[in-house]
């Protein structure tokens, strides 16, 4: 959600390291969350659905001294999981090669670990730095089974496997400034910047052919360039004791960063995020009526996505709804959120593959775009460790 300008001693904000400076002395903030996705995907003439569950993030924030906080975050960055099987329909290939079946399988994930400091050098201003470590392993397999229709009867199979290991460090810098701050309300502007990072994964690729005997055709060990874009975010936050409003804008410079994929009609464009949200707590101090101490949240987000496929933009937009449930009379709480969103579209057509992308022979390929409608449920446990956590027990 939104939060580049948000700062609160009761909640850790992993979007901006400058917010770590707001942690109270002799307190600890700990968050852990998970999310479940229910996705309905369809093309112009087919549809499917699937469910996924992931640990979303683990956060911890502790004070080092007054105005200086240390934060740690572990967040999934990407997750790969697919299995696709296709049958060749090109009559020219069927006549000259035979029946061909393609199968693609991918699995793995990457995770980012952030270690950061937030410092409040003077009143109404905070500055922070996060060091990020990216780590993960992704495996992609493909099989091509050829059944000749003339002369030969033995199937020929081509196996390919690519394993990518990611291990790289990056940095995020952030700042927050209170344009207005008193006992009744606070109005804050926040900014973050992440320079681009070349992940340069270690790639091992092998290709094996099998017919009457097995033959290893190619084995390669190399590194290739893959960049995460530079990112700039700016946000506004207006908060009172009962009400809060957040607005964020993020720009990611993908255009011209990584090589396009003309074989599959993929190009890259700059990414724009807009996120907005409001929160209302009827009466935070009401010890008798539980529902008056609950948090009620409503939000919206829009993302034009960085991939352009076959000339089509893939927009992602969602409405979010959330509730915060206080735990007893303390400052810890359980947060539950619901997202209702849509990504992509159901366009179809024919894509012309240039000769430079298909081995010297221009060709055309039919395609169908996929539209996803998704429902996400997220659950987060937010624990606030108060002064007594730091008291040394005494026994008589």
Describe the residue ranges of each PLM region.
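N-terminal, post-signal peptide beta-strand-biased segments of exported outer-membrane/organellar beta-barrel
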Residues: 1-75, 341
């Amino acid at each position: 959600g939104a939060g580049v300008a948000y700062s609160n001693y009761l909640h850790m904000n992993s979007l901006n390291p400058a917010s770590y400076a707001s942690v109270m002395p002799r307190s600890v903030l700990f968050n852990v969350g998970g999310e479940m996705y229910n996705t309905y995907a369809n093309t112009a003439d087919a549809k499917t659905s699937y469910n996924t569950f992931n640990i979303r993030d683990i956060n911890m924030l502790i004070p080092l001294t007054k105005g200086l906080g240390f934060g740690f975050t572990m967040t999934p960055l990407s997750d790969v999981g697919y299995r696709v099987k296709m049958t060749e329909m090109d009559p020219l290939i069927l006549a000259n090669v035979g029946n061909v079946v393609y199968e693609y399988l991918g699995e793995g994930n990457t995770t980012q670990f952030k270690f950061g400091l937030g410092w409040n050098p003077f009143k109404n201003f905070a500055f922070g730095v996060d060091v990020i470590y990216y780590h993960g392993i992704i495996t992609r397999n493909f099989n091509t089974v050829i059944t000749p229709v003339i002369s030969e009867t033995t199937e020929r199979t081509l196996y390919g496997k690519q394993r990518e290991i990611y291990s790289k460090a990056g940095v995020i810098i952030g700042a927050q400034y209170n344009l207005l701050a008193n006992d009744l309300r606070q109005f804050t502007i926040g900014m973050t910047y992440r320079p681009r990072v070349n992940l340069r994964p270690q790639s091992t690729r092998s290709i094996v052919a099998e017919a009457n005997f097995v033959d290893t055709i190619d084995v390669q060990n190399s590194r290739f360039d893959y960049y995460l874009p530079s990112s700039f975010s700016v946000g506004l936050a207006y908060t009172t004791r009962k009400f809060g409003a957040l607005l964020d804008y993020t720009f990611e410079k993908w255009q011209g960063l990584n090589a396009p994929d003309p074989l599959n009609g993929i190009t890259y464009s700059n990414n724009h995020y807009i996120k907005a949200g409001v929160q209302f707590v009827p009466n935070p101090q009401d010890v008798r009526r539980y529902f008056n101490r609950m948090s009620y949240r409503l939000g919206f987000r829009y993302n034009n996505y960085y991939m352009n496929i076959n000339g089509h933009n893939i927009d992602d937009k969602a409405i979010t709804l959330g509730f915060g449930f206080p735990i007893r009379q303390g400052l810890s709480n359980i947060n539950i959120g619901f997202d209702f969103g849509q990504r992509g579209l159901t366009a179809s057509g024919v894509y012309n593959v240039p000769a430079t992308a298909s081995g010297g022979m221009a060709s055309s390929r039919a395609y169908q775009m996929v539209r996803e409608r998704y429902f996400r449920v997220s659950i987060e446990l937010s624990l606030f460790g108060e002064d007594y956590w730091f008291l040394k027990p005494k026994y008589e």
